[in-house]
Every structure is written in structure tokens, then in C-alpha cells.
Amino acid sequence: MGLKYKSEDLNAVEAWLSSVPGNVYNNPRRYLINTGNLIHLAPITDVWAGDEKNYHLNAPSLLYTKTKGNTLFRLNIHVKDVGHTILIGPPGSGKSVHLCMIAAQFRKYKNAKVFIFDKGASSRILTLGVGGNFFDLGNNDVAFQPLSNIQNEKERSWALEWLCSFLVQENVVVTPNIKDTIWSTLTLIATTYPKEQLTMSTIVSSLTDETLIETFKQLTINGSYKIFDANKDSLSFTDFQTFEMEKLMQMKTIIAPTLLYIFHRLEEVLDGSPSIIILDEAWVFLDNEAFSQKIREWLKVLRKMNVSVIFATQSLVDVTNSNIFHTVLDACQSKIFLANPTAIEEANKKLYKSFGLNDRQIQIIAQAIATRDYYYTSVKGSRLYDLSLGKFALAYVGINKADQNKCDEILKNYPREEFNDEWQKYKGVDNYDFT
């Protein structure tokens, strides 16, 4: 064939290595080749496997998952220093499981804090398992004292804002005169009464304006929202905290004052440590004018406090119809879409395109398998991946109604410190079972 060759002796090993495509450094006798041959030999494409680590936190990736062909995919929600993320998918697609895995794995970071606003108690087992606090906001045992710190002028200003937002919700026009009346009353009771008497009943008894008295009476022990009239606050924080909101969601008028108070208290514990705030069923937050404005403000400033907000909802419409849609879209650099076979329908396709997806990406979401596949996209890249969870992980993040009943039984019959032992017996796993 007219080929010239040389029988290698001293460089035999290097000659063989140089025949392996892409291994060009071992060839001491490099010959010119045309670009066609070069393209066939050069490793110019590969499956995107995600960032090797979380560069913002200088720590390992958040999650190691599996993608096409069992290739490793490293999931990180941070894009540079922005960790705000949105997770969207229809019911039964694995939303709660993924949120719990994000929460569980985020604990690997030094001094990490996790705060979950849950619906359906899907994160209760995980919260109890890691020794966190679980607050059921619809439980009669929950009590708040929002005026407890008004002896501090900054706290007094917040209390004024909180009370005025409640007036607006109750269709009371807030005039400068009303603000002055509330402020002077807050100042009076702050300088007159001890901390345990700084309650809603005290401020109502100190007011003279009938409109204010009748409106704020709802927040007292004799009103509909008596949880705000405690003389001692039951709210406390740990590094892993879950607030169950399902019952609260059924009382729409109390959602805003409750969440505004909790988020105000939450600001006190955000100290720059890596933190995430997970908002499950985020439509509740986006649908409320007072709270949506708070989220608009938070998304812009929490990044500087090393806090990531994760929105999760079952409906794209809830997000796109929100008056802060563009704020959420711009702030959430990472987006995770759950499998949705109806994604290719014309109405849904328009909604997905409003999130910046193209036809091919929408088709991937439509063809994905529910409860198994998730589609991540950001400016860094896109990847369909599978959490590929083992039995041990699923024992804590894959929770159903029967599991909730068993949890109630364990908490009733055993001390809290024995919860993990009893739960693992029930699930047939142990601390060393990672299969």
C-alpha cells in the first residue's frame, strides 16, 4: 500500500501509547496529519458532569447523581455566589423527595443552616432524624409573642410595620395619623410594662381608636388568631428547622402575619453561615401581596448573607402569574424541572419557554420518567439526572401516609433520642446500610 514504517525498539512503549486516540504526548515521532483525522482522534465532546466541587463554598458538590449511561453528574445549586433555585413539577413527580435530599446533603457544609417551610410534613422524618425542630403551625401548642422585644426601637419599628400590614389585609386604610397612634402606643407599653406583658391584649387595652381596637382584637386571646397573644414565645431555632404549613394554608387570612413574623425572627439567626430556605408549595408565598414583596426584597439581599432560597411548586402558572415572576426568574440561576408528559402541549410549552427552555429541552422533560428523572438547567449547562437513591436514603426522604402514622406511634411510645433506632427498625435499615 506504499505505507512507510519503522520498527521501534527503544521507544516501543511510547509508540504503542501514541496509537491510543487522544494520547499525543507519548509520540516522539509526530507526523503532520490533516484536520479530518485530527477531528476523529481529538476528545472534543463529553457528557457534562457538573462542577467538580461547590466553588462558592469551596467544598464538595451538593449531590452526586447518575445521568445517561450511568455517568456521574455532580449537582450544585450555586452559580457563582447565587444559590437561589426553583424546582417545578406536577404532583407525584418526586418534588418532596428531591427537596429532602437537598436539605439533607446541605448539612455537609460547615456551620450549615437549613430552614424548610413544608406542606404535608414530607420532611418531618428527616427533621427528626437529624435532631432538628419540627413546628406544626396549625397546632394549638404554637404561640407567638411578636411584641416581646419592642423595648428595642428597631424592633418597635418592625412591630409598627407588621401591625400596619395586618390593617391593610383587613382593608383598613393606614394613614399617617394611624401610624402615629400605633407608634405612640407601642412606645408607651414598651416603657411601662415588663417583657411578659408586651402582648396584643396589652396594646389593644391601651388603644383608644375603635377601628384599631376592633381590628387588632382578632390577634388577642379572645379573637380568631389568638396564637399571637402569648406572654412567652414558643418559637426557637436550631440548625435544621421545619415549619409544617398545611393547616395554616387553610386559614388564608393568618398566613401573611404568621410568615412575616417567622421570617423576621429568622433574619436574627442568619449570620453568614451557608444557609438554605426551602419554600415548598411556593404559590402560598407568591400569592400574598405583603409576602411577595418581602420575597422580592429577600432575593436581592439574602445572597450577600450566604443564604439560598429554593422555591418549589407544582404549577408553572402559579409562578408566571405572580407579580414578582421576573424577579424570581432573574434571581433563580438554577432551575430544576420534574418529569411532565404534558409539557409538549401547546399551552404548557409556552409556559416552559417563559423559563428560557427551548423545544428540545421541553421534549426531554416530557419524555422523562416521573419520580426518577430530573432536569437541571443553568448558564453552566443542562443535564437530565437520576438521584438513584438507596434504601437508607429513601427511608428518610420517601415518606407516605403509613410512614406518618408510624412516626406518630414512635413519638408517642418512645423518647425523642430513640427515634432513629425505632425508625430504622421499622424500615429495615441501619446506619451502615447504604445500598
Describe each PLM feature range:
Residues 10, 119-120, 139-140, 282, ...:
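Short, ordered loop/turn segments at secondary-structure junctions
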Residues 4, 17, 21-73, 79, ...:
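P-loop NTPase motor domains
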Residues 93-146:
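Walker A/P-loop NTP-binding active-site region of P-loop NTPases
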Residues 97-119, 280, 409-435:
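A short, charged
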Residues 12, 18-49, 90-91, 316-435:
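C-terminal regions of RecA-like/P-loop NTPase motor modules
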